[in-house]
Amino acid sequence: IVSFYGDNPIISENLSKLEKKQFTSTVEILKQYEKEKRILFGGTFSKKKLKISPTILRTKLNETDILQKELFSSLLPVVGINDKESALKQISQTSKPLAIYLFGGNKKIHNHISKVTSSGTICINDVMLPVLIPNLPFGGVGQSGIGKFHGEEGFRNFSNQKSITFKGFLFDSNLRYPPYERVKKFLKFIFQI
């Protein structure tokens, strides 16, 4: 973070400012974590500049509010999970996430988690790739969103595929209209052939 933003991220031109309402709600979260001494890194902010330094928050598993909320800020809540079973249990107890981000080199664990979980995306050892690859569909499933965007999938999801049918006037089968005895006789004849 220091190599990206320097020793004081608040004065960095590379750190975006927040919209005022978003800044205020994010600072409230930050103050609560500061009070509980659960800021692992960062935590500085400037009301004048509407900036919050990149901040890592030590979060508990039962704090579903911050873990499921879209923060749209530089806060990163993290939960330490010791093993694969605990991670799977946590994922299965919550609604389907927009994305699951896995870090580590064990391909067996990656494959297993991919098979037994449901999410919009799984990203391994990165957090940006799913939105940086233009033709890769990205989006949620269930409560995290419906449909995908990016590339061809995005075009399909944001387009209205309209069905148009046309029937001419020259031929109009009376099999479509009551009484349906004629239809039954016709179908019996067809299926006997």
Model-derived regions: residue spans:
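Conserved C-terminal structural/oligomerization subdomain of aldehyde/semialdehyde dehydrogenase
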Residues: 1-2, 52-193
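ALDH superfamily catalytic-core signature
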Residues: 1-62, 124, 186, 191-192
